[in-house]
């Protein structure tokens, strides 16, 4: 899949690097005890320093992208890269309309389109481990996962009716890393979303496509009370790269320079 997306972007004009440091929050990385335990990483997942977008990508930002890269407009995109519902809430191929406010996180967007957006600004989608690492923080603690009240707050969002209008991105208080909206706004694509529940022994073999689709390694749930993680894994691993839903968006990451 990565080779396909790279080839696509080679023929696109590059939108430029995401130079504004304020859009990204730096995270130091380290050994992270994931709620998902891989057989080959029982002591924790090693996460290199990286930076994560403070907020999810908005409709306005994605509109700028599709105007610059018209092959990602909903009436031109190849169906192998986006299903028919892709950006279906927009008024038109290059018009947002009343159902897609500029400041709301973009949804109805496929993995392929999200990945292309990130690559067009010199970034990438975060891995599951990076996303989980950033999402473990609350407003004051870098790891709040053992707090039952914090977990209950997240589960309350998951039980919210999905037909409610989305708030604007960036309304939540930043967490301890300076990242907003990790919970309570939209689900988010990760680079390796489809490998989360797949068994295999290819995880460290170096083929990006095999890792993405075939090689997660055997998984177990280390913290069985963290139902929110189970829900995220179940949701993401049920999707194809061309799928789009009303409550699934994304944000970009970049490796430390």
Task: Explain the meaning of each model-derived region.
Residues 33-41, 59-64, 73-74, 221-227:
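Short, solvent-exposed loop/turn elements at domain surfaces
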Residues 6-15:
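Bacterial N-terminal signal peptides
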Residues 46-150, 254-257:
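Active-site microenvironments of metalloenzymes and redox enzymes
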Residues 20-23, 48, 104-105, 109-111, ...:
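Disulfide-stabilized, aromatic/cysteine-rich ligand-recognition loop
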Residues 155-183:
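Short, well-ordered junction/capping motifs at the entry into regular secondary structure
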Residues 36-37, 193-201:
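Cytochrome P450 core scaffold surrounding the K-helix E-X-X-R motif
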Residues 1-3:
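Positively charged n-region of N-terminal signal peptides that target proteins for export
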Residues 24-31:
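Mature N-terminal segment immediately following signal peptide/propeptide cleavage
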């Amino acid at each position: 899949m990565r080779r396909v997306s790279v080839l696509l972007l080679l023929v696109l004009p590059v939108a430029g690097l995401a130079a504004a440091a304020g859009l990204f929050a730096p995270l130091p990385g380290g050994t992270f005890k994931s709620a998902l335990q891989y057989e080959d990483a029982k002591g924790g997942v090693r996460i290199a320093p990286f930076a994560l977008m403070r907020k999810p990508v908005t409709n306005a930002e994605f509109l700028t992208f599709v105007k610059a890269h018209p092959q990602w407009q909903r009436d031109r995109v190849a169906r192998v890269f986006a299903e028919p519902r892709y950006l279906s809430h927009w008024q038109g191929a290059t018009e947002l309309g009343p159902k897609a406010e500029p400041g709301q996180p973009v949804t109805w967007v496929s993995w392929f389109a999200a990945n292309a957006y990130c690559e067009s600004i010199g970034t990438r989608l975060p891995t599951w481990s990076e996303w989980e690492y950033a999402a473990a923080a609350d407003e004051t603690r870098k790891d709040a996962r053992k707090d039952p009240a914090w977990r209950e707050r997240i589960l309350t969002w998951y039980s919210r009716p999905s037909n409610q209008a989305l708030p604007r991105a960036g309304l939540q208080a930043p967490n301890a890393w300076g990242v907003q909206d990790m919970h309570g706004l939209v689900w988010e694509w990760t680079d390796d979303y489809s490998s989360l529940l797949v068994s295999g022994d290819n995880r460290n073999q170096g083929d990006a496509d095999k890792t993405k689709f075939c090689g997660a390694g055997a998984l177990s749930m280390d913290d069985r009370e963290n139902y929110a993680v189970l829900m995220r894994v179940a949701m993401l691993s049920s999707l194809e790269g061309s799928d789009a839903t009303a409550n699934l968006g994304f944000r970009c990451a970049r490796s430390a320079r």
